[in-house]
Amino acid sequence: MARKCVITGKKTTAGNNRSHAMNASKRTWGANLQKVRILVNGKPKKVYVSARALKSGKVERV
C-alpha cells in the first residue's frame, strides 16, 4: 500500500534544500498521513488518510 491519502490523493513530494550559498540538495516533504480504519465498500479497512481529510470530516473513523 502506497503512502498516499485515499481521499484527497496527497502524497510525498520532492524538491530541494537550499543553503546560504544556494547549493541544492534533494529532499522530500511527507504528507501528514494517519493510518485509520474506515468503511470501504461497507467493510472496515485500514488505510492512509491525510490529517486534513480527517479534520474536515471528509471521512469518518470506524
Swiss-Prot record:
Where are the disulfide bridges? none
Spans traversing the lipid bilayer? none
Q: GO terms for biological process?
A: translation
Top-rank lineage group of the source organism: Bacteria
Q: Gene3D superfamilies from the entry?
A: Ribosomal protein L28/L24
Ribonucleoprotein: present as a keyword of the record? yes
Give Gene Ontology CC terms. ribonucleoprotein complex; ribosome
Q: Name one GO molecular function term.
A: structural constituent of ribosome
- Family annotation (SUPFAM superfamilies): L28p-like
The alphabetized UniProt keywords are: Ribonucleoprotein, Ribosomal protein
> What HAMAP family does this protein's entry cite?
Ribosomal_bL28
Database matches in PANTHER family: 50S RIBOSOMAL PROTEIN L28, LARGE RIBOSOMAL SUBUNIT PROTEIN BL28A
Subunit arrangement?
Part of the 50S ribosomal subunit.
Family listed: Belongs to the bacterial ribosomal protein bL28 family.
This protein is called Large ribosomal subunit protein bL28
Q: Which organism is it from?
A: Bacillus subtilis (strain 168)
Identify the coding gene.
rpmB
